[in-house]
A protein has these predicted regions:
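Conserved H-loop
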Residues: 1, 118-120
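Cytosolic-facing regulatory segments adjacent to core modules
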Residues: 1-72, 86, 184-188
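Short amphipathic alpha-helical segments
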Residues: 8-10, 88-90, 128-130, 164-165
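Residue-level signature of catalytic and energy-coupling elements of molecular machines
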Residues: 49, 79, 116, 149, ...
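Active-site-proximal loop/turn and secondary-structure-junction residues that shape catalytic pockets
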Residues: 53, 82, 121-123
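Helical hairpin unit composed of two closely spaced alpha helices linked by a short loop
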Residues: 73-117
């Protein structure tokens, strides 16, 4: 996803605007007012997006070091791990992903900042009756599971079963947490805003 696409998604999420309306330009006066109101704070937020394709862990480390010195660094997000490149010295893609995973762990320690790395899943969860992801579904390497302090999955029943009673609902599945419990957190899914929120409690 390009830098522009990410910024548009963040704008829609913050302003609670239908992403499709923004793409097509079908915004009314109220929509434009909300867009402008949220554009200022977002432009001033300390968020830096680098959409260079196929970066290596060494390049990520170098950019993070520079950013930490110049601006400060509180969080690093990789979207997504399998799009990164290794150093070219490994014999298989699985070994390359393992190397990338270990390198991101080292970057987190050096920068004293958490690294959130998105990852692809294998197709195994598509073939099960219960499509909820499991640790074994992490694609191309078991090293991701081993290196990560926390592994979390997102699941929406409506994606697989359109007639489900759990419409506009999602589950945040904490499958691994090195220093805490595992479990599932219910969320609300606002698809038109590409946004998750706290689940509404039923009384």
């Amino acid at each position: 996803m390009s830098r522009e696409q990410l910024v548009n998604r963040m704008l829609c999420s913050e302003a609670m605007l239908d992403a499709q309306k923004l793409r097509t330009g079908e915004l009314d006066d109220n929509d434009w007012a909300e867009l402008i109101r949220h554009m200022g704070p977002l432009s001033e937020a300390p968020i830096y997006i680098d959409d260079t394709p196929g970066v290596t862990p060494m390049e990520v480390r170098s950019k993070c070091r520079r950013l930490k010195v110049e601006k400060g660094l509180g969080l690093i997000v990789i979207d997504y791990l399998q799009l990164m490149s290794g150093n070219g010295r490994t014999d298989s893609r699985q070994q390359e992903i393992s190397e990338i995973s270990r390198s991101l762990k080292a970057i987190a320690r050096e920068m004293e900042a958490p690294v959130i790395a998105l990852s692809q899943l294998s197709r195994a969860c598509e073939q099960r009756a219960d499509h909820r992801p499991m640790l074994s579904d992490l694609r191309e390497s078991g090293a991701i599971e081993q290196d990560a302090d926390v592994v979390a999955f997102l699941y929406r029943d409506e994606y697989y079963f359109p007639d489900t009673e759990k419409k506009n609902m999602a589950e945040l599945i904490i499958a691994k947490q090195r220093n805490g419990p595992t479990g599932t957190v219910d969320l609300t899914w606002m698809g038109q805003y590409t946004k998750f929120g706290n689940a509404l409690k039923k009384f």
